[in-house]
Amino acid sequence: DVAGFKTGYKSPWIAASLGVISGVIIGAIAEYYTSYDYNPTKKIAESAKEGAALTITQGLAVGMKSCMLPLIILGITTYVSYAVSGMFGIAMAAVGMLSFVSATVSVDTYGPISDNAGGIAEMSELEPEVREITDKLDSVGNTTAAIGKGFAIGSASFAALSLMVSFLYAFQPEGSQLELNFTNPLILAGALIGGALPFLFSGMLIEAVANAARKMVDEVRRQFKEIPGILEGKAKPDYKTCIEISSQGALKEMRMPAILSIIFPVISGFLFGPYFVGGLLIGATLSAIMLAIFTGNAGGAWDNAKK
């Protein structure tokens, strides 16, 4: 049912309100798992006393466990929104969650600003008390970034569901029932491959970070050898070259994942048909939601554990 208003004119309002409420709850869950005030991050800090291996293990555990509650909230919101207003209700839930977009973007930019402030304080050789203040601000910034990612992930999941239904209606014969039958091997194969795509993109991006970091390390070693007095604080390092390495690496390495994400569904549609693409969209959406929540919360918790 596309827009079956079960509760009359109030149906879209109820669905949009559910989107707002679910966004707030998902943000609170992200804060619990990433803020240094709560047990998950404190456990990672305790594990760090035993070595790097336990720190990584505990952080992975926190990230994985943090996926469950947001997905339950998203599932309940999706079901209730559909029950009161059909697929239009799911779209309205996405609109409700996106109503926070100005606040979430502002909150998300707080983290990098406070982090850079700490870097400036350290490079300017300010008093240790200044660095302590910026560290606390940076910790808050990590948490707010995780909260902002929660809103973005939730609204993106609702939007993806709405777009998926639009795709289904585009190829479904007129008058027939809208459905994706998972006994169809093409749909199942598409879902399996779609579930692997977010991991492929994530792997490519992580490898890109490693490549840029390797170039950065080589550049830092070169400067230590060729510019005497850096370690003693008598000479200034060449910051510009390091910044160019990181920015150029980020821009260049994003090209291939972006191209693949665009052409893969198109080529799959021409080769295997719309049912395969439908399964691909479902698998990629479900996998991407969980992977995004996991990586966002695990990274925020690790970053705050060192505070």
PLM regions and their residue ranges:
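Hydrophobic packing and interface segments
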Residues: 1-307
